Amino acid sequence: VAKSAADRGVLAVLHPHVGTMIETGDEIQQVLHGSSISLCLDTGHLLIGGTDPAELARQAPERIAHVHLKDVDSTIAARVQSGQLTYSEAVKLRMYRPLGQGDVDVPAIIEHLWANGYGGWYTLEQDTILTEEPRDEGPLADVRTSAEYLRRVLGQLH
């Protein structure tokens, strides 16, 4: 797939994601060892699937072509992994946290990718499920918190 896409001027990128064929650490390792396709480092879905995204950034920085930054409460993620909660239930319980308020080592990921010449995009994601109109700013407040955190982390790289 990667070669066929490249022959057409397109970069194919695999996005490991909860609830798909490529979710767990073993499945990601199979992709890394059995193909040349680039990866989307989705910090949230990797952590929920049992992969340390900072370790993956250290292990295979040359394979990372896109990054989705989100933070995760690993206690809730463990309940998804064990089958105690569905993914949707976990999202409703605020499994996804503003950057810096969860268990993803965002600074280590950014620092390692930066040191290895990563020049791609970082997408800030704040997944949520709203069942009613949010009070005050709702998820917008989380996005602002994440953006401020990201500015601080990036400011420390220079």
Which residues are covered by each model-predicted region?
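Acidic/histidine-rich catalytic cores of soluble enzymes
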Residues: 1-103
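Alpha-helical elements of Rossmann-like donor-binding domains used by nucleotide-donor carbohydrate transfer enzymes
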Residues: 27-30, 108, 145, 149
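Short acidic/histidine-rich active-site segments
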Residues: 123-129
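A structural motif corresponding to the C-terminal end of an alpha-helix
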Residues: 1-12, 107-119, 152-158
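Short active-site-adjacent structural elements
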Residues: 77-78, 130-134
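Residues at the N-termini of beta-strands
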Residues: 66, 120-121
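C-terminal helical cap(s) of enzyme catalytic domains, especially alpha/beta-barrels
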Residues: 134-158
